[in-house]
């Protein structure tokens, strides 16, 4: 993606194999500037923001199973970030603290392995 993308969604069927967390990244503007929507091995589902330092914007309890495929979707509408599992909204947050309004998309993993076959952008 490019740094010109604004409102879009990214989705992928992902499987964690041995990582601390993994999922989708959006509005990427470099290595230290992006949003995350991730499944965490400590049984959390999290939306976070990397702006030189990582900040959790919102997290909820979520029973995680390694080697299980999850359909994740992250939708970005202006300063609102919405997280879906299997096409159902499970978490959302508004970022009012200098929100990122544009940027690319991709996958992110923390200390381990994440498996997917495709990424869909709309």
Regions found by a protein language model. Give the residues of each.
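Beta-strand-rich interaction surfaces with strong enrichment in secreted/lumenal proteins
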Residues: 1-3, 24, 58-64, 95, ...
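Secretory/extracellular carbohydrate-interaction modules
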Residues: 1-52
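Carbohydrate-binding surfaces in secreted/extracellular proteins
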Residues: 12, 66-94
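Residue-level signal for tight coil/turn positions that link beta-strands
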Residues: 41-42, 78, 111
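Short, aromatic/His-centered strand-loop micro-motif at the edge of beta-sheets
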Residues: 51-73
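Extracellular beta-strand elements of beta-rich domains used
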Residues: 74, 117-121
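Flexible glycan-contacting loops in extracellular carbohydrate-active proteins
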Residues: 93-118
């Amino acid at each position: 993606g490019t740094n010109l993308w604004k409102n879009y969604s990214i989705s992928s069927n992902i499987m964690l194999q041995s990582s601390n967390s993994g999922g989708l990244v959006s509005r990427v503007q470099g290595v230290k500037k992006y949003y995350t929507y991730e499944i965490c091995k400590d049984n959390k589902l999290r939306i976070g923001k990397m702006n030189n330092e990582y900040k959790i914007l919102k997290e909820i309890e979520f029973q995680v199973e390694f080697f299980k495929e999850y359909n994740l979707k992250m939708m970005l509408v202006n300063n609102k970030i919405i997280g879906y599992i299997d096409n159902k909204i499970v978490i959302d947050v508004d970022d009012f603290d200098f929100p990122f309004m544009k940027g690319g998309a991709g996958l992110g993993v923390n200390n381990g392995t994440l498996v997917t076959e495709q990424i869909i952008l709309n």
